Amino acid sequence: MIDINNANEFIPHFGEEVVSDTLTNNNNRVFAISDSTFENYENYCKLFEEKGFVKREYRSHGSFHFTAFEGENTGIFAIFYGDIKEINITIENESKYFTYSDILGDKKVSSQITQVKLEDYGMSYVIRLSDGRFIVIDGGRNYEPHVDNLFKCLKESSQDEKPVIASWILTHPDSDHYHCFIAFCEKYEGEFILQKAMFNFPEPDAYHLYHDLAKVGYWGCDTERLPHMYEVLKKTGAEVYTPHTGQIYEIGNASFEFLNCIGDVVHHTYWKNKNELCLVTRMEIEGQTVLWMADSSCKYSRLYEKYGSYLKADILQITHHGFGSLGDNEEIACYNAINPSVCFLPAADYKCYHRMSAYRKSTNHIITKMDVDEILTGGDGETITLPYKAPSTAKEEYKQKYARGVMDNGAHCWYFTGLNTADKDDFTFSFLNAINQPANVEINIYFKDSKDIERIKATVPYSLNEFSIIDKEKVDGDWLFHNPNSLSKIEIPENTEFAVRFISDIPLVIFHKDHKDTYHTSYVK
């Protein structure tokens, strides 16, 4: 019988050259076979049956194939990603997948999703099932308001004296996602019932199994509370399940299919941080599909390459609070495939429209280029009843919030006139960038009766900055291969009147200590 201790005696088995072998925790071993074929995948499936495993499940969509095998106390979950030619085989000792069950009670209430109120950002979602039980996804930080808001949501929506949580799904060990679970269980011990918990990250004694964890920033202030989490979880008496990609769990009247987990990314050399090991889930409920992305990186999880049009969903939880996740183009490809009608964005309005999210390339694509009916941010808390259709006014509401955020942050284009080269201070400007990302600014200098200097490039970091626009240590005047009017090729005339134009990719405020701007404007898409 194959198990995690002897699996390397059987894998690789068909002459493959590129095989990764990783223990992801004490009971799970993952093999990734690159540049492979569907024929090899079928051969592995036959091999597992020859070794005494029973095929329990098979499903496919597009070029994706999933097969689950049950052995004595061991499960094997084999995937073929046809579009990237990769076989992924997870071997799990003490697997509970085949004994999992959940009993759906009589219908008592309508199904709902609540995005729990957040002061800043985090991830806290409550799904109310038709039988009155709940699913919690993450929970947020261990801040008292996060903890209390979550309990209040459960208590007010519950049909029972004690809210019954059918399953608490923890997507990854980041403080703004799982720390609330610890504080919630401690503060409200005995006031709720937790039936099951689902997550896929290492036990406290399994960190030695990972490669270069310190280098990729896995262990630190976010993850050091994992041992405490396990202690708290044990006290709840909940059954614990480790979901793997391809598995489907029926929870009440909701169905969860897992599209990504640590086993998909941990073996790759490009693995950078714990966001990439997020559980990504495709939930079906009340005839609608919801895609929960947590903080997943579309680039490194390769979601679009693996699933393509299967990602289509009615409702999307925008990944990583809309902050971007290491790969704008890959995120945009995913969002286009998902093509949602409604989006959840787990960040407060301020964080989204004034500080960060709306100005990240991929999130901005959703706001300005996709025909999304509604974007629900987390600042006030939002509850939708399923099946859900956005109100007719919702699109205009988020468009107005975005336009207001742009105007409040400044302008994209600024002109200053009446300057003179005789005063070197006239070349020095102050820049207030209130958005938490660098502004890319192009600068043109127009001299009276002399050649202009064109397309000076400057990067303006977040916060207040001051520099001379002709200081070659602060600006790049020669970044273009061919620019006859570059900073190094045009001599600055003496005692000459000049004007300056700034064009920025994000709104900012530009000012001069001696001169008021002549004109400024913004373009809101």
Go through each PLM region and give its residues:
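Compositionally biased P/S/T/G-rich terminal and signal peptide-adjacent segments
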Residues: M1-A32
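Amphipathic alpha-helical segments
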Residues: F10, D35-R56
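Ser/Thr-rich, low-complexity intrinsically disordered terminal regions
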Residues: K55-A78
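Core dinuclear metal-dependent hydrolase active-site scaffold
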Residues: E94-P163, K234, T242-K312, T383-K399
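Active-site environment of divalent metal-dependent phosphoester hydrolases
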Residues: Y121, Y143-E144, P173-H179, P204-Y207, ...
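Active-site metal-binding motif and surrounding structural segment of the metallo-beta-lactamase
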Residues: G132, E144-E203, Y307-F323, N339-C343
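Binuclear metal-ion centers of metallo-dependent hydrolases, dominated by the metallo-beta-lactamase
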Residues: K196, P204, H208-E257, W271-K274, ...
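Gly/Pro-rich, tryptophan- and cysteine-flecked surface segments typical
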Residues: K399-K525
